[in-house]
Amino acid sequence: LKLYTYLAPSKVCDGVGVFALTEIPKDTLIWRIFPKEYHKYKWEEIPNEYEDYVTNMTFCDEEGFKIDCDLDRLYGAYYVNHSENPNVRIGKNDEYISTRIIYKDEEILYNYPPQDRIWQ
């Protein structure tokens, strides 16, 4: 994949965000969420007191969660912030795809599903 992004202080929250290094055309595959290897776990495999931590640090759904086998290699998807006006979507094969032209230095934003909005 072509390098399209960089990390910098977010413009929408107190933290880090992902920004366009160059103009990104509409319908461009920016990156895949999951690398070649990850472990999938069911919710019943962990104690209830760890659920909040797991939802903060992994990709999860109603069935369970996935942990990247190579967390030494974090990529942009870990730093994408929420917006009601997103400029990316998640494709059927777990990839981030631009929904419109994303301009150079514009923050990349995704509309998290309600169950993923843990800060609310």
Language model features with spans:
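Conserved catalytic SET/PR domain of SAM-dependent protein methyltransferases, capturing the structural core
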Residues: 1-120
